[in-house]
Amino acid sequence: MFRNSYIQQNSDIQAAGGLVPMVVEQSARGERAYDIYSRLLKERVIFLVGPVEDYMANLICAQLLFLEAENPDKDIHLYINSPGGSVTAGMSIYDTMQFIKPNVSTTCIGQACSMGAFLLTAGAPGKRFCLPNSRVMIHQPLGGFQGQASDIEIHAKEILFIRERLNTLMAKHSGRTLEEIERDTNRDNFMSAEAAKEYGLIDEVINQRPA
């Protein structure tokens, strides 16, 4: 059950020339092998790795819902290393994070850019983290369309609507004003982990686990 949930992530890693480690566990019933991501899922750890797109978003949402059904009162830990991607795919993850009962703690490892940064900031208050050398980038949504002038106008209005919605939610989660978010996302805005904390995108920069 767990193994199938990470087919896409595993394929991405293998395509990059790596292999997904397997973990063998001993029990009274004998040995059982898990890929490392499936084993971590048993510990309520989810990895969001790579571009945010529909297939990956569906897997993330399914895992969030599954872990809620397993235990609605225990935190879920979402680790993010993403350059961003589809707004609609990202919003499906965002809505599911807000919908389920467990708190979703978010941690940036590597990078959280664009939609990745949005999801990082959407974690439960007080439970949003970055590792010290992570990079965070926020900007306005990107879009392009070709066709008749009337259709281009329709899509331009949709992009403006999406931008306003994302900015409003970012302001809500970061504690910044809407005007500040609009100004600071006008162009690509890269931040260190400490700068992301000062801006309100995360709560803490963590160097190591508490003793």
From Swiss-Prot:
Coiled coil: none annotated. Its EC number is 3.4.21.92. GO terms for molecular function: ATP-dependent peptidase activity; ATPase binding; serine-type endopeptidase activity. GO terms for biological process: protein quality control for misfolded or incompletely synthesized proteins. It is found in: Cytoplasm. It holds the Pfam family CLP_protease. PROSITE patterns: CLP_PROTEASE_HIS, CLP_PROTEASE_SER. SUPFAM superfamilies: ClpP/crotonase. GO terms for cellular component: cytoplasm; endopeptidase Clp complex. The active site is at residues 114, 139. Keywords: Cytoplasm, Hydrolase, Protease, Serine protease. Fourteen ClpP subunits assemble into 2 heptameric rings which stack back to back to give a disk-like structure with a central cavity, resembling the structure of eukaryotic proteasomes. Cleaves peptides in various proteins in a process that requires ATP hydrolysis. Has a chymotrypsin-like activity. Plays a major role in the degradation of misfolded proteins. Belongs to the peptidase S14 family. This is ATP-dependent Clp protease proteolytic subunit.
